[in-house]
Amino acid sequence: MVAHRATRRKRASATQLYKTCKLSGTCPEDVINKVEQKTWADRILQWGSLFTYFGGLGIGTGSGSGGRAGYVPLGSRPSTIVDVTPARPPIVVESVGPTDPSIVTLVEESSVINSGAGVPNFTGSGGFEVTSSSTTTPAVLDITPTSSTVHVSSTTITNPLYIDPPVIEAPQTGEVSGNILISTPTSGIHSYEEIPMQTFAIHGTGNEPISSTPIPGFRRLAAPRLYSRAFQQVRVTDPAFLDNPTTLISADNPVFEGADTTLTFSPSGVAPDPDFMDIVALHRPAFTTRRTGVRFSRLGKKATMQTRRGTQIGARVHYYYDISPIAQADEIEMQPLLSTDNSFDGLYDIYANIDDEAPISFRQSGATPSAQLPIKPSTLSFASNTANVTAPLGNVWETPFYSGPDIVLPTGPSTWPFVPQSPSDVTHDVYIQGATFALWPVYFFKRRRRKRIPYFFADGDVAA
């Protein structure tokens, strides 16, 4: 049997404890601070509210109406409501005193009304004289205004976006002069001849890329800039100018920036080299070629004078070091690499005449045994139709052509299974195992009109 747990009694809240213990003075400090809003969080909010004011923005824990203007969707502008107050006539309010009558009459007394001018008195018994008149002229009013000066102005604005091409006026005849006239082709009959313009190269070779970004080249100082009158020419003979020029200007600095950058110096005492006196800047190096050789150049700036304002005035110096001279090219007599005689070179030509060839032997030095390949002469067969072969390989070497031996291509057996004969009834010089073969040289330079190539060649003649 499961025992029932006792019901947990709810603890009194801080507000309930404050009501019972405040009178007796036994309330804990945290209960008093929480109820009276004296905690650190409440104090921070109270101090911050002294400097900020969010009234009228609808920020709070109310009904969520969004303030007086309501919520505005994102990406839209709030609608503007204009309050129009109806016009009312002004009402004059008269104060009523204690001595004034309580009943106000609607009609004023006649004695108070001002009648204005007096009534005229007529004398005599004749009465009034009645006069009648008649006229036939119509009553026409002259409504013509007085003469005035009228100025009429007109302005014409041409907008190329709203001009129809057929409406464009054809240009006049161009002037025959050295100028280039570029016009827009229009409709209609022209008084001149339209010649299409072609692109031509004025500067350069004409092979410069025009449709893509070219590879940026290296910026080099032109020779006339280095050897002009604006620069003082100084020749340097110390090799330290190539890799460590700071030793020629100031004391040796172990933390060297590099020889391929612009070096700056502060004008100090005496320089180790008198040619580098008062140098404040030494620009990056440049290699140039002269008639005498290859030259290593640097531009330097001196600060010989300095004004009170701090402006440095000095000459610009061109320091150069000749690396290597360029000697005149010696004329070397050219020797032929190969001779024209048909000497034995250790290779076997399958198209050579076998009767004129000698046995091929391969010899090696040392203990390696030698091997000899004997070649047996055989009768050569020629076709009835022969043709001369001419291969334009050049005039340097003479290329001899000979008729080759009999070549037997592989053929499939007529019966199956195929039993090879032993020994073979026909003895040939060369056997080809496979479908690869060497083409006759005359077909190397023949223009191909079709993709068909003869399957094989025998004895230098085409097998039809």
Swiss-Prot record:
Highly phosphorylated. One of its GO terms (molecular function) is structural molecule activity. The keyword Disulfide bond applies. This is Minor capsid protein L2. Disulfide bonds join 21-27. Interacts with major capsid protein L1. Interacts with E2; this interaction inhibits E2 transcriptional activity but not the DNA replication function E2. Interacts with host GADD45GIP1. Interacts with host HSPA8; this interaction is required for L2 nuclear translocation. Interacts with host importins KPNB2 and KPNB3. Forms a complex with importin alpha2-beta1 heterodimers via interaction with the importin alpha2 adapter. Interacts with host DYNLT1; this interaction is essential for virus intracellular transport during entry. GO terms for biological process: microtubule-dependent intracellular transport of viral material towards nucleus; symbiont entry into host cell; viral penetration into host nucleus. Minor protein of the capsid that localizes along the inner surface of the virion, within the central cavities beneath the L1 pentamers. Plays a role in capsid stabilization through interaction with the major capsid protein L1. Once the virion enters the host cell, L2 escorts the genomic DNA into the nucleus by promoting escape from the endosomal compartments and traffic through the host Golgi network. Keywords: Capsid protein, Cytoplasmic inwards viral transport, Disulfide bond, DNA-binding, Host endosome, Host Golgi apparatus, Host nucleus, Host-virus interaction, Late protein, Microtubular inwards viral transport, Phosphoprotein, Viral penetration into host nucleus, Virion, Virus entry into host cell. Belongs to the papillomaviridae L2 protein family. It comes from the Viruses. It is found in: Virion; Host nucleus; Host early endosome; Host Golgi apparatus. Its main location: virion. One of its GO terms (cellular component) is viral capsid. It holds the Pfam family Late_protein_L2. A motif (Nuclear localization signal) lies at residues 1-12, 445-453.
